[in-house]
Swiss-Prot record:
PROSITE patterns in the cross-refs: C1Q (PS50871), EMI (PS51041)
SUPFAM superfamilies listed in its UniProt record: TNF-like
Protein name per UniProt: Multimerin-2
Predominant location: secreted
GO biological process: cell adhesion; cell migration involved in sprouting angiogenesis; negative regulation of blood vessel endothelial cell proliferation involved in sprouting angiogenesis; negative regulation of cell migration; negative regulation of cell migration involved in sprouting angiogenesis; negative regulation of cell population proliferation; negative regulation of vascular endothelial growth factor receptor signaling pathway; positive regulation of defense response to bacterium
GO annotation, cellular component aspect: basement membrane; collagen-containing extracellular matrix; extracellular matrix; extracellular space; multimerin complex
Organism: Mus musculus
Signal peptide from the UniProt entry: 1-22
Post-translational modification: N- and O-glycosylated.
Glycan-linked positions: S63, T67, N205, N214, N249, N261, N350, N379, N439, N472, N583, N728, N766, N839
Bridged cysteine pairs (disulfide): C58-C122, C85-C92, C121-C130
């Protein structure tokens, strides 16, 4: 159909068109990028003697400057990583530092000049239709419109007669196309923008412009033939090329979407891994596995980039080839049409002969054109099939990678949840330690009260002894007076009665007077004796009331001991909870071992998949291009993980052995208490069953505290956390303080019962107390008590001094962290890449937080606890808590709606003068007084 249309179009135009645009058959159109104007057009424009109508249009060159971004080169940079030295390495200094070289593309803004054809009036003509003759008219356009469509102006160096070799050179092996895949999003968009969308004829088409210019004022029937031919050509090209380009554009769009989603997933996984590595203490196998994974991701990114570059080059070459082919087809058709038009100008028989020869010469040309178009269609179909196959393979590869990344994301989420559980357990331990501190403070207060009561009792005892001594002296004086009186009566001389009968009345009066005086003295003596007895009775009553008061205080002390016993039971329950937490930690260790094994299997499977996907030759080639090999291969990693698994199993066995040993020690301690009841009796002389239970409870508490300290030490060694050492030292100090408190309580209880266990007999005896004898008796009783092997009074004094020092050290540890604290909120909004200023300060103890600048400066060296909460605006947001640039804690939110709040905590050791602040790196922070936007911290203890 195409040859028939072309032949009919040529014959039809031979009767209606003029020969103004005819030129030599051997002459071709010049390329659009070449400067200047074709010689035939110049001659046709200057020769106005034949036909002055519609000869006044001439083509001119039009150029414009275009700016674009192109990848000019690749840049190499060093990636620093470090890992701890393996065990047994002789020349290692604790940390092994590795450097590897990575590449990234470098883009540059470039410019190029695009040249097109613009039809204007020929020299010497002007006007809207170029009909006005003006010898002084300027042929160059003063202000180019610049609105011509530039579609075929970049094709160069293609010949229509050889389309098959060009397409054969475009085809490359599948292995080379699958090696590189990076930056498909921007490049795919640029390729889609460069494709012709509507398949309309460009305004710079020479044939269209020429025909349109020459047929403006002629009303020949050949004009309809030109308009009939152009839609057929457009329909043919649209039918053959539009589905191919549409499918190719759709595939590129889907591929770019998949790559974009993959890049987002990789970035999210990278951020999650980074958070876990910063939030927990990385072990050697974690660091090594992370370095391996990062290196593999870098290699895959380089391969993706190279693959995308190859795909872009192939698409560019295909586009150039197709555009060259279509441009040459249009040029050939225009040349043949002009030859036919030129043949129309010859008169008579010569014209018919020339027309016949031209028709005969033009007949085989459409056939060759149809053959070339068919070959072009077949090549494009084959290219479409190959592209579809490779796209399917690429989609399957991307699906596999997506599934692997999802699996890794689930594993990372599990690890993150396990770290949250560990943090909760640590918080529980801290709360229990605080409760123990409160109990210790209560015990200290009770100890002080008991000491005060004992001092008061000592003073009362001395007062009672003094009163008893005075009463004893009074009784002795009374006995002496009574004896003197009896002696005086017995010694009275009665022999002089007879001789003194005469003076009897006077003597009788004297005797009566004397007897009266004696009676008066006796009455006075009886009154004195009665007052002394009343004083003694009142003293005894006071002593009984004092003993009743002491008995009430003893009851209160017994109630206090019951309360302490209940607290000890609660502490026992807390110890059981810690045992349960230790069992949970063992389970977590086993789960981590299973996770490590699964990750090892995934790594080996990924290695096999990469080898099958890219080929052994490509992997060997890329390994040769690498600057240095990796320090470990997969076999060594597998052996290292197996060694770690065996170590974990040995550690679990050690834990079980330790549990059995602790149970044996508990049984032995219980048997020792049963075999030596006199120790409990020495502690409680009143034979109270509740006191014996208290002694046993104290012994069990001591054993549980020792076991708890050993478990905490093992957990600290397992986790290798820097803050665990301070926690272990705090627990040890707490343990020593509890032992000191227990020892002091025992001493005070023993002293109390030794002094007042027989106070009723003391009151009933009604005798004086000799303090010297009492002290001697107590010392003899102490000497009679058996001492254990290796014990001495010097050792007891030494233990008391050591416990006092430990007690003072624990108090100093927990009392020196109080004078620094701050809490501030923010009422101003913030955007990305800036420091968030919390300008509303509610607490600023120590004046170490500066609200006008938004940062906290450490006034002293120590361990600080920080907390930050931020309310993000719409869309995802991310920030980080920065400590003097050497440590960062991320805070992020992935919710699309506004008002989402994210919170994080950090414990860090700061030197004096170091700063801490919060900065926003993505998204925005809401403006206004939000309760969820706050920043605070305090000093825990100095170091």
């Amino acid at each position: 159909m195409i040859p028939t249309l072309l032949l009919g179009f040529g014959v039809y135009l031979s009767w209606g068109l003029l020969g103004s645009w005819a030129q030599d058959p051997g002459t071709k159109f010049s390329h659009l990028n070449r400067p200047g104007m074709p010689e035939g057009w110049r001659l046709g424009a200057e020769d106005t003697s034949r036909d002055p109508i519609r000869r006044n249009w001439c083509p001119y060159q039009k150029s414009r400057l275009v700016t674009f971004v192109a990848a000019c080169k690749t840049e190499k940079f060093l990636v620093h990583s470090q890992q701890p030295c393996p065990q047994g390495a002789p020349d290692c200094q604790g940390v092994r530092v590795m450097y590897r070289v990575a590449q990234k593309p470098v883009y540059q803004v470039q410019q190029k000049v695009l040249i097109s054809v613009d039809w204007r009036c020929c020299p010497g003509f002007q006007g809207p239709d170029c009909q006005d003759h003006n010898p002084t008219a300027n042929p160059e356009p003063t202000e180019p419109s610049g609105k011509l469509q530039e579609t075929w102006d970049s094709m160069d160096g293609f010949e229509l007669g050889h389309p098959v070799p060009e397409f054969n050179e475009i085809k490359v092996p599948q292995e080379q196309q699958e090696n590189l895949l990076q930056n498909l999003q921007n490049d795919a968009q640029s390729v889609e923008d460069g494709f012709p969308g509507s398949w309309e004829a460009p305004p710079s088409n020479l044939t269209d412009e020429m025909t349109e210019a020459n047929l403006t004022e002629f009303e020949f029937p050949g004009r309809t033939s030109e308009h009939l031919l152009q839609p057929h050509i457009d329909a043919f090209l649209k039918a053959h090329f539009s589905p191919i380009w549409k499918n190719f554009n759709d595939s590129l769009h889907s591929l770019s979407q998949a790559i974009r989603n993959l890049s987002l997933d990789v970035e999210a996984n990278h951020q999650a891994i980074k958070m876990i590595q910063e939030g927990t203490v990385a072990r050697a196998d974690f660091q090594e596995l992370g370095a391996k994974f990062e290196a593999k991701v870098q290699q895959n990114s380089q391969r993706l980039g190279q693959l995308w570059q190859d795909v872009e080059d192939q698409l560019h070459a295909q586009r150039r080839s197709v555009h060259h082919a279509l441009s040459d087809v249009q040029a050939e058709v225009s040349t043949k049409l002009k030859q036919l038009v030129k043949a129309q100008e010859l008169p008579g028989a010569n014209g018919s002969l020339v027309m016949a020869s031209a028709a005969a010469a033009a007949r085989p040309e459409p056939e060759s054109l149809q053959a070339r178009l068919g070959q072009l269609q077949r090549n494009l179909s084959a290219l479409h099939m190959v592209t579809s196959q490779r796209e399917e393979e690429l989609q399957s590869t991307l699906k596999n990678m997506d599934s692997v990344l999802k699996q890794h994301a689930e594993e990372i989420k599990e690890l993150y949840s396990e770290s949250d559980e560990t943090f909760d357990q640590i918080s529980k331990v801290e709360r229990q330690v605080e409760e123990l501190l409160v109990n210790h403070t209560g015990l200290r207060e009770l100890r002080v009260i008991l000491m005060e009561k004992s001092l008061i009792m000592e003073e009362n005892k001395e007062e009672i002894e003094r009163q008893l001594l005075e009463l004893n002296l009074t009784l002795q004086h009374l006995h002496a007076g009574h004896a003197d009186l009896i002696k005086y009566v017995k010694d009275c001389n009665c022999q002089r009665v007879n001789s003194d009968v005469d003076v009897a009345p006077e003597g009788h009066r004297d005797v009566m007077h004397t007897l009266e005086e004696t009676q008066v003295s006796l009455d006075e003596q009886h009154q004195l004796d009665g007052s002394s007895l009343q004083a003694l009775q009142s003293t005894v009553d006071a002593m009984s009331s004092a003993m009743d008061a002491y008995r009430g205080e003893g009851e209160r002390a017994r109630a206090e001991r019951a309360r302490i016993r209940s607290q000890l039971r609660a502490l026992d329950h807390a110890v059981e909870a810690l045992k349960t937490a230790a069992n949970g930690t063992r389970k977590e260790i086993r789960l981590l071992h299973g996770s490590f094994t699964a990750l090892l299997e995934d790594a080996l499977r990924h290695q096999a998949v990469l080898a099958a996907l890219f080929g052994e030759e490509m992997i060997d080639e890329m390994s040769e291009e690498a600057p240095r090999p990796l320090p470990l291969d997969y076999e060594q990693i597998r052996l290292a993980l197996q060694d770690a698994a065996s170590g974990l199993q040995e550690q679990a066995i050690g834990w079980e052995d330790l549990a059995t040993r602790v149970e044996a020690l508990e049984k032995a301690a219980g048997g020792f208490v049963e075999q030596h009841p006199q120790l409990a009796e020495g502690l409680e002389p009143s034979h109270d069953s509740g006191r014996e239970e208290e002694a046993m409870t104290l012994a069990e508490l001591e054993q549980e505290i020792r076991r708890l300290s050993s478990d905490v030490k093992q957990i600290g060694q397992c986790c290798e956390a820097s803050w665990a050492a301070s926690l272990n030292s705090s627990l040890e100090d707490l343990h020593s303080m509890l032992l000191d408190t227990q020892h002091g309580l025992r001493q005070h209880r023993q002293l109390f019962h030794n002094l007042f266990q027989n106070f009723q007999g003391l009151v009933a005896s009604n005798i004086s107390l000799d303090l010297g004898k009492l002290q001697a008796m107590l010392s003899k009783k102490d000497k009679k008590q058996p001492r254990g092997p290796g014990e001495s009074r010097k050792r007891d004094k030494k233990q008391v001094v050591m416990s006092t020092d430990a007690h003072a050290k624990g108090l100093e540890l927990w009392e020196t962290g109080s004078p620094v604290a701050f809490y501030a909120g923010s009422s101003e909004g913030a955007t990305a890449l800036q420091m968030v200023k919390f300008n509303t300060t509610s607490i600023n103890v120590g004046s170490s937080y500066f609200p006008e600048h938004g940062y906290f400066r450490a006034p002293k060296r120590g361990v600080y606890l920080f907390a930050v909460s931020i309310t993000f605006g719409p869309g995802p947001g991310m920030g980080q808590l920065v400590f003097e640039g050497h440590h960062r804690v991320p805070v992020y939110s992935t919710e699309q709606r506004g008002g989402s709040t994210a919170t994080t905590f950090a414990m860090v050791e700061l030197q004096k003068g170091e700063r801490a602040w919060f900065e926003l790196i993505q998204g925005s922070a809401t403006k206004g007084s939000q309760p969820g936007t706050a920043f605070g911290g305090f000093l825990m203890f100095k170091t």
